[in-house]
Amino acid sequence: VLALIDMDIVCFRAASSAESEAFGIAKSRCQDMLDGILGKVKATEYRAFISSPSNFRKDVLPTYKANRTAVKPVHLQKLKDYAIKKMGAEMSPEGLEADDSLAIFQKEQGTIICTIDKDLLQVPGHHFSWEISGKGWKRPDLFLEQTELEGNRLFFEQCIKGDKADNVIGIKGLGDKKARNML
């Protein structure tokens, strides 16, 4: 099994968890998270992707992700650089996000997308989303086989309702429920 890893998220979560720690702690947590994912999906190999510094979506929609104003974790960029130099991560092609690279390579046989990003569920194939938790809630590991039909439905649903996480405005008056019912 070839695991396709969203290394942006792995690095972000590791850096966030080590905000007041030394960089070595962030590196260790990043490696532990990657090893945990690879073990759970029984990967024989992996490709991990980091988003390109440029993003074609911002050329199309200048407000794309403009709502993300929080300060980035202190070790994030250094951890991404480390992941590329020492952990075998790859920089996505110019203008593309890690998500795009995962979607492109998911077309190969024997792959599994490994991310907690809901947008990748638009891509047919095998998916793994690792356990996440917050104050008073927990979502367990999730393995999913996504169909092309359901992936397309999710894509069009998002086109209708928009995506608050990425600051993409949908059709006025059409939210989650109406978009879901339309499709």
Where on the chain are the PLM-derived regions?
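Short acidic, glycine/serine/threonine-rich loops at helix termini
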Residues: 15-16, 60-62, 123-128
